Amino acid sequence: MTAPAAANAALDQTVVSLPVQETARVVRDTRPLRLITCGSVDDGKSTLIGRLLWDTKAVKEDQAASLQRDSSGKQNDLGLPDFALLLDGLQAEREQGITIDVAYRYFATDKRSFIVADTPGHEQYTRNMATGASTADLAVLLVDARVGLLEQTRRHATIATLMGIRQFVLAVNKIDLTNYDRARFDQISHEFRELALSLGVRQVTAIPVSALKGENVVYDGRASMPWYDGPTLIEILELATTRSAQTVGFRLPVQRVSRPGESFRGYQGTVAGGSVKPGDSVVILPSGMVANVSKIVTFDLVRNAAVAGDAITLVLDRQVDVSRGDVIASIDSQPTTGLAFDAQLVALQPEGIQPGKRYWLKSGSRRQRVQVQPVSQLELKSGKWNHADELPMNAIGKVHLAFDEQAIFDTYEQNRTTGAFILIDPDTNNTVAGGMITAKRAALGGIHAEESRVILSLPADLADQLMATELFASRREDVEVRRVTAGKAVNIIDAIDG
C-alpha cells in the first residue's frame, strides 16, 4: 500500500461510515427525522429533494400536473421535469433559478417519516441556512462532482456542526456528468472526511448520486455504478437517529400562566427536555422555589406523564410565584443560572455585531437585556478562530454575554431548546443574530457602561454590602448598583477601585 493510500485508509477508519447491513442491526429509530440539505450554489439541493418527493410518491396529482406545466420548455436532455420547482416557492427563486428562503417539505416511506429543509447556497443567504440547521438531526451536504468542495460547502458544514448536527451524508451529485468516475468520487469523499474530522464529526456516509436521474436517491444506481455497493440515500435516512431531548432533566419554559377561575392555576408551555409525572419535585427558576407536580393537563385530558415535545399545563401542589419566562425544571438536574455565559452565534444583519452593544436576548419566552462582546471569528478556509472585536453579517463568532439579571440556560449540546437564543436590536427590533450557549463564565458580576456611568448588577446581599462601604459613597456619581436574584456573593470592591 502506498503512503497516500495508507493515509486515506487511516482517515476512513477514523471517520465512521456504517454499511447499511451493519446499521440495520441497530434498533430502528422510528421518530420523524428532520434533515437539511446544504452545499454551494447549483450543487442540486432542490433537485435532490424534488426527486426524493417524486420517487417516494409524496407529490400529489395536482402538484404533478403543475410541475409538468411549469417545466414546459425547461425539460432537460432526458425529457424529465424540473424537480427543483417542487421546492422553489418564491417568485424571485423561480425567476433566478436559485433558493433564497428555507423550504420545508414532508414525505414518508413505509418505514419512517421525514421533514426536510432545503436551504440556500448563496453566501448572502447563509443566515437562512443557519435557521434550517438549528432544528435538524442530519445534514445532507451536496457537492458537484465536477467542481468538488468549495468555500460555501465548508461554510455550510461548519455551521451545521456548530448547530449540533453530528450525522452527515455527503452526496456527490452529478456523478453522471463525470462519466461515473470512481476516482473522482473517492477524492471528494476523502477531502470531506478530512474536513469532518477537523470539525469533530465522525459519522459520515458518502454516496455518489445523480439527483436528476434518481440514481442512488431512492432507487440504486448499480447499472451505472457497479463499483458502488453501498446504501441509497433513502436507506441511510431511514436508519438515522434523532437527537434526543432526554439527555438532561425535565424542562418547561413557561409561556403562559392559566387562571380560568380562582380554583385553578396552571403553567403552560411545551416540554423542552426530559419527562415529568405527578408527584415529581420541581424547581422554579430563577427564584429557586420548590414544589411538587400535582396534575398534568392537556387540551381535553389529564395525563399521567409528559415528555419532550408535549404541550401541557402543569399544576403544582402549592401556590408559588411563577411568571412567563420562568423555567420549571427537575430539582435533581437543573439548568445553569448566572450573569455571564460564553456563546457562539451567526450574525444575521448588515450591521453585524458591535462590541459592547446592548441587545435584547430572547430564549423561549424569556427576554432580557444583555451586553455582547465579540471574542473571535471563524475563518472558514483554515478552520481557525481569529481574534475579532466585531462580527460582520454572516460571520460565525464566539462572544461573551453579560446579563443585568440572572439568565437560565443549558448548553446547546445538552438541550437545543434551552441552549439557543436570538439577539434583537432594541432600536430596530431586527433579529441580528442566532446563537447557542457553550458554557457559563466565571463572572465578577454584571458590569457594563451606560454613557459615563458604570452599572453593577449584583446579588441583593452583595449589593447591600457594597453600598454600605465608604468606597461606594465616594463613587456614587460614577457607579449605579442594581439588585438581582440572590446568588453567591463575590468580593469585587478591589476590582471597582482598580
UniProtKB/Swiss-Prot annotation:
InterPro entries: CysN_GTP-bd, CysN_II, CysN_NoDQ_III, G_TR_CS, GTP-eEF1A_C, P-loop_NTPase, SO4_adenylTrfase_lsu, T_Tr_GTP-bd_dom. Pathway: Sulfur metabolism; hydrogen sulfide biosynthesis; sulfite from sulfate: step 1/3. This is Sulfate adenylyltransferase subunit 1. Keywords: ATP-binding, GTP-binding, Nucleotide-binding, Nucleotidyltransferase, Transferase. With CysD forms the ATP sulfurylase (ATPS) that catalyzes the adenylation of sulfate producing adenosine 5'-phosphosulfate (APS) and diphosphate, the first enzymatic step in sulfur assimilation pathway. APS synthesis involves the formation of a high-energy phosphoric-sulfuric acid anhydride bond driven by GTP hydrolysis by CysN coupled to ATP hydrolysis by CysD. Residues 97-101 are annotated as: G2. Signal peptide: none annotated. Its EC number is 2.7.7.4. Residues 118-121 are annotated as: G3. Residues 210-212 are annotated as: G5. Residues 30-246 form the tr-type G domain. GO terms for biological process: hydrogen sulfide biosynthetic process; sulfate assimilation. It holds the Pfam family GTP_EFTU. Residues 173-176 are annotated as: G4. Residues 39-46 are annotated as: G1. Gene3D superfamilies: P-loop containing nucleotide triphosphate hydrolases, Translation factors. The keyword ATP-binding applies. HAMAP family: Sulf_adenylyltr_sub1. It catalyses: sulfate + ATP + H(+) = adenosine 5'-phosphosulfate + diphosphate. Belongs to the TRAFAC class translation factor GTPase superfamily. Classic translation factor GTPase family. CysN/NodQ subfamily. The keyword Flavoprotein does not apply. Heterodimer composed of CysD, the smaller subunit, and CysN. GTP binds at residues 39-46, 118-122, 173-176. GO terms for molecular function: ATP binding; GTP binding; GTPase activity; sulfate adenylyltransferase (ATP) activity.
